[in-house]
């Protein structure tokens, strides 16, 4: 068992918030993202973001400029290395798959974006341009809940550990050695050596906005626990992966045209659902720059 989110309080006066599950995710209405946001409305959006970790706004037919402007309310926009940008807007990157593409869908494993960087993204702001009537959902899970549901003994065991991250399985040497290649509509050709570069982050981090602790591991970018042998590290990481991805820690968002979604990249994992073969799907995203994760 784990604690569900508390019922909505009276603090939301400028926006309407409808939770998606008892763990994370909320729909926000009563706001027009095409217009500048006053401080009171923005503070409520930020409050909902820190509370629900994943928030989405239906029916927001925003332009690229408005997409960028809204994203900058969360912090500086800093595109990730792997994705192509749309013409004329380097800050806006594409998640696009043609109906006839047959390569692997990018992001189809549970992961946190770009943890191979020294300062991974803080948040991602994504909007749906053209999506299938059904299929192509995105799943999210709460790394707060994953941490909070560990036993006190396990928490004490892992809280001081660090994990080595790299992109070797995504565009480094391990990726080059496998056959499961991503389709190339959205993905840049990346330098293999850059993919093999390693960085180290704490296994448990404290969110600077909410003050809550969360696990910070994912099977896409994590290579090993620092200072352990593979025989010691692998089973512990595997346990944490399996624990974090429990179904009751998740939510699933169904995309609709003109929907804008923001996820907190420090305290969640997400994955694409590759169930829309033969259908065109096009979303754009901006990435909010982060700081080095810390305990």
Curated annotation (Swiss-Prot):
Keyword Metal-binding: yes
Site (Contributes to enantiospecificity): 221, 285
Key word Oxidoreductase present: yes
Temperature dependence: Optimum temperature is between 35 and 40 degrees Celsius.
GO molecular function: 2-oxoglutarate-dependent dioxygenase activity; metal ion binding
Alphabetically ordered keywords of this record: Aromatic hydrocarbons catabolism, Dioxygenase, Iron, Metal-binding, Oxidoreductase
Residue sites binding Fe cation per the record: 111, 113, 270
Any single biological process term in GO: catabolic process
EC number assigned by the record: 1.14.11.44
Reactions accelerated catalytically: (R)-2-(4-chloro-2-methylphenoxy)propanoate + 2-oxoglutarate + O2 = 2-methyl-4-chlorophenol + pyruvate + succinate + CO2; (R)-(2,4-dichlorophenoxy)propanoate + 2-oxoglutarate + O2 = 2,4-dichlorophenol + pyruvate + succinate + CO2
GO CC list: cytoplasm
UniProt pathway: Xenobiotic degradation; 2-(2,4-dichlorophenoxy)propanoate degradation
Effect the entry attributes to changing residue 107 to I: Loss of the dioxygenase activity
Membrane-crossing residue ranges in chain numbering: none
pH sensitivity of activity: Optimum pH is about 6.5.
Family to which the UniProt record says this protein belongs: Belongs to the TfdA dioxygenase family.
Protein's job: Involved in the degradation of the phenoxypropionate herbicides. It can also accept (RS)-4-chlorophenoxypropanoate, however it can only accept 2-oxoglutarate as oxygen acceptor.
Subunit structure: Homotrimer.
Protein name: (R)-phenoxypropionate/alpha-ketoglutarate-dioxygenase
Taxonomic path: Bacteria, Pseudomonadati, Pseudomonadota, Alphaproteobacteria, Sphingomonadales
């Amino acid at each position: 068992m784990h604690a569900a989110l508390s019922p909505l309080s009276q603090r939301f006066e400028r926006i309407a918030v409808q939770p998606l599950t008892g763990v994370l995710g909320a729909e926000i209405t009563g706001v027009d993202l095409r217009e500048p946001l006053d401080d009171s409305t923005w503070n409520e959006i930020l409050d909902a973001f820190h509370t629900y970790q994943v928030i989405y706004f239906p029916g927001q037919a925003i332009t690229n400029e408005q997409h960028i402007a809204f994203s900058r309310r969360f912090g500086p926009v800093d595109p990730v290395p792997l994705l192509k940008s749309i013409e004329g807007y380097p800050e806006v990157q594409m998640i696009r798959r043609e109906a006839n593409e047959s390569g692997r869908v990018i992001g189809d494993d549970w992961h946190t974006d770009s943890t191979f960087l020294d300062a991974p993204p803080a948040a991602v702001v994504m909007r749906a341009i053209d999506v299938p009537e059904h299929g192509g959902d995105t799943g999210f899970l709460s790394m707060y809940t994953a941490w909070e549901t560990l036993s006190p003994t396990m928490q004490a065991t892992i809280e001081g550990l660090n994990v080595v991250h790299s992109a070797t399985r995504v565009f480094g040497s391990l990726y080059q050695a496998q056959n499961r290649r991503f389709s190339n509509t959205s993905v840049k050709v990346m330098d293999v050596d850059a993919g093999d570069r390693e960085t180290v982050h704490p296994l448990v981090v404290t969110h600077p906005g909410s003050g809550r602790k969360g696990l910070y591991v994912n099977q896409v970018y994590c290579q090993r626990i620092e200072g352990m042998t593979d025989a010691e590290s692998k089973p512990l990481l595997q346990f944490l992966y399996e624990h974090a991805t429990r179904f009751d820690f998740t939510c699933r968002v169904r995309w609709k045209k003109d929907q804008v979604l923001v996820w907190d990249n420090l305290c969640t994992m997400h994955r694409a659902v590759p169930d829309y073969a033969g259908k065109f799907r096009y979303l754009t995203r901006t990435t909010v720059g982060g700081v080095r994760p810390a305990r």
